[in-house]
Amino acid sequence: MSTKLRYLHHPASQPCRAVHQFMLENNIEFQEEIVDITTDINEQPEFRERYNPTGQVPILVDGDFTIWESAAIVYYLSEKYDCSSSWWGSTLEERGHIQQYMHWYAYTLRLGGGAFHWTIFAPMIYGYDKDFTVEVTKGRFLLYESFDILEKYWLKDGDYLCGNTLSYPDLATCQDLVSHDAGRIIPTSMWDSHPKVKAWFARMMDREHAKTVSAWQYENVRKYLDDGVKLNFQRKTAVLKGTEVYSGHNNGIIYNGDDDSFVTQHG
């Protein structure tokens, strides 16, 4: 007898939303289990030992097998359920192109998630008396720089990031931008100066399952921005990985005021 998949996640997490959308898009049955990352439950030794030594979500449990890291989970599900080859490419060249995107994305656009995290969640976690200017600046730089590459390279010849067919990079990237859009991190001028990215994001958000998995993020982040309703963070450690600022990394990049541009300070 087969056991239903257990999916441990939280809708505040971009990787969690991307995996969730993939499962919905492919009609994969699963048992949903929300891990309350506003607490420190996923940092407890028992949780780390049983599910993930990093304490991060998403996590997929398939019988006696447990797997974490969003792209790894989606690849596993693609193989297990013989999903369309379009998700990871049907030819050697397509697969290489998609892997190229995922590697680029991991150290650029994904790290740009710091723009959202340090603007919206970090003050709730660490206190509003803390100054996160450096962290926000790094995140915005990576985010805005990524917009240029999305526009000029990844969306240059197709409706989707890796061609004219929907693939997993579209889901991962869309859910990253959901956080920035919900948090009003991306100015109107940035969307307007990147029409291909703007049209692609609108096309992605027209998908039923994209709306479903992102509803929590929009609702709760906008409640905070518009009405001052904060999430009750009891933890005092980072919620999302990939947002830490390391000494010397992108050192010298500074935000240049309200025109949403960046300059590099030398010397």
Swiss-Prot record:
SUPFAM superfamilies attached to this UniProt entry: GST C-terminal domain-like, Thioredoxin-like
Lyase found in the keyword field: yes
Species this protein is from: Methylophilus leisingeri (strain DSM 6813 / VKM B-2013 / DM11)
EC number: 4.5.1.3
Cleavable signal peptide: none
Record-level GO BP terms: glutathione metabolic process
A Pfam family matched in the record: GST_C
Domain spans labelled GST C-terminal: 91-224
Involved pathway(s): Xenobiotic degradation; dichloromethane degradation
Induction: By dichloromethane.
Residue ranges of every copy of the GST N-terminal domain listed in the record: 3-85
Keywords: Cytoplasm, Lyase
Keyword Cell cycle (UniProt): no
Assembly and oligomerization: Homohexamer.
Entry's family note: Belongs to the GST superfamily.
Name of the molecule in the record: Dichloromethane dehalogenase
Catalyzed reactions per annotation: dichloromethane + H2O = formaldehyde + 2 chloride + 2 H(+)
Annotated Gene Ontology cellular component terms: cytoplasm
PANTHER family documented for this protein: GH16740P-RELATED, PTHR43917
GO molecular function terms attached to this record: dichloromethane dehalogenase activity; glutathione transferase activity
